[in-house]
Amino acid sequence: MALTTPLSITAIVPAAGVGSRMKADRPKQYLLLNGKTVLEHTIEQLLAFPLVNKVVVAITDGDPYFPELTLAQDNRVIRVSGGKERADSVLSGLSYVQEHQLSEWVMVHDAARPCVRHSDIDKLITEVIPEHIGGILASPVRDTMKQATQEQCIETTIDRSVLWHALTPQLFTTELLYSALQTGLDKNLSITDESSAIELMGYQPKLVQGRADNLKITQPEDLDLAEFYLQKMKKETK
């Protein structure tokens, strides 16, 4: 890593979602992968990265699953109340980070992305700090992209050379991201990820190319693929 000054980063994991598309008996972050929940894999991967000091996880009040996890007793894992929308949950985490002065920088990571690699996190940090106000991991679109009509017919083909899939982590300064999210929520703006809130303030976050296998579990078939990737990552670290 090219950074020469000491750096500490807090990871924020919004984990208050229901994940209805999984059609499971519990939220997708609590489904099992290789004997552990998806959330455990995700948080453990973040905690194992040297620059991450704490993981602030936003959980729905009354969540019956999180307290049963071993990592719930880890003093590096901080639980805060999650909100109705992703932005509310992230803002709750940011409030804790600011109140306790945990770090100048935060990175927000999806609870359902357990396959993020340390090499990608390292690349994100190295390319974003200190030259940019923030940035995200992203993957270039490889497929031909079609714009559809309301009747689901093809209206036109979109130039994919300028399109990227937004991934996580997304890395920003604590103060800027808090201000962006709070402003967006106050104005009832559409905030789909942290970067979109920053963009609405007129900034252009850095795109850092990450691996496409940093998948987000959203469909039942994603579990098998995530399990394969996790096993592959484990073999590569031996």
Curated annotation (Swiss-Prot):
Q: Which reaction does it catalyse?
A: 2-C-methyl-D-erythritol 4-phosphate + CTP + H(+) = 4-CDP-2-C-methyl-D-erythritol + diphosphate
> Its annotated pathway?
Isoprenoid biosynthesis; isopentenyl diphosphate biosynthesis via DXP pathway; isopentenyl diphosphate from 1-deoxy-D-xylulose 5-phosphate: step 2/6
- The site (Transition state stabilizer) lies at 21, 28
* Family note: Belongs to the IspD/TarI cytidylyltransferase family. IspD subfamily.
Per the UniProt entry, the Enzyme Commission number(s) are 2.7.7.60
Highest taxon above the source species? Bacteria
Keyword annotations: Isoprene biosynthesis, Nucleotidyltransferase, Transferase
- Asked whether the UniProt record includes Nucleotidyltransferase among its keywords, one would answer yes
Q: What is the lineage of its organism?
A: Bacteria, Pseudomonadati, Pseudomonadota, Gammaproteobacteria, Vibrionales
What's the stated role of this polypeptide? Catalyzes the formation of 4-diphosphocytidyl-2-C-methyl-D-erythritol from CTP and 2-C-methyl-D-erythritol 4-phosphate (MEP).
This protein is called: 2-C-methyl-D-erythritol 4-phosphate cytidylyltransferase
An annotated GO BP: isopentenyl diphosphate biosynthetic process, methylerythritol 4-phosphate pathway
Residues of the site described as Positions MEP for the nucleophilic attack: 160, 216
Q: Which NCBIfam families match?
A: ispD (TIGR00453)
* Any one GO molecular function term: 2-C-methyl-D-erythritol 4-phosphate cytidylyltransferase activity
One Pfam match, by short name? IspD
Say if the entry is tagged with keyword Chaperone: no
